Design a protein with these regions (language model features):
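Short amphipathic, basic-aromatic surface patches that mediate peripheral association
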Residues: 54-68
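Short, compositionally biased P/S/T/A/G/V-rich stretches that sit at domain boundaries
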Residues: 21-44
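Exposed aromatic-hydrophobic patches
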Residues: 93-99
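Short, well-structured beta-strand segments within conserved domains
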Residues: 49-53, 101-114
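Short acidic/polar inter-strand loop motif in beta-rich domains
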Residues: 86, 112-121
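Short beta-strand segments within Ig-like beta-sandwich modules, predominantly Fibronectin type-III
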Residues: 84-91
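Short beta-strand elements bearing conserved aromatic residues within extracellular beta-rich modules
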Residues: 76-78
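Contiguous beta-strand segments within globular domains
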Residues: 43-57
Length: 134
């Protein structure tokens, strides 16, 4: 009996934790005027890099996460060297030096709605990518 109960709890825990692990949302077409992302990167005097996200036609709205979608609003996802680092809910982010392990490092930003749906233009993800050289 104990072994049966253990397996039921174990497999349900594994299944349920993986069910929501990656928020595999849909793709949603952005509304016109389309969002534009400009990113400014500056070396931090102590360690790492400071990123500033200048967004046009897109509103960061952490107060609405998992509540409702509004046109061209939500959050950003930050990838460094193709590794998801964080969700971004404000215009500024400090990226520690440990994420910049290569001579040429790739930074990518993608836009998502409050329900974790990827924003697109003509079914292509809205993203901005550039390189940071050490």
């Amino acid at each position: 009996m104990f072994l049966k109960l253990f397996f039921i709890i174990f497999f349900n825990t594994i299944f349920l934790s993986n069910l929501y692990a990656h928020h595999p949302g849909n793709k949603i077409e952005a509304k016109i005027p389309y969002p534009i992302i400009n990113i400014k990167v500056s070396r931090d005097k102590i360690e790492g890099y400071n990123l500033f996200f200048d967004l046009q036609n897109f509103k960061l709205s952490p107060e609405n996460i998992e509540i409702r979608n509004k046109n061209n609003s939500g959050y950003l996802q930050l990838f460094i060297n193709d590794i998801k680092i964080s969700r971004i809910y404000s215009s500024w982010f400090h990226a520690p030096e440990r994420f910049f392990s290569q001579k040429e490092n790739s930074i990518k930003i993608k836009l998502f709605t409050n329900f974790h749906d990827e924003l697109t233009i003509d079914n292509q993800p809205i993203e901005f990518e550039f390189k940071v050289l050490k």
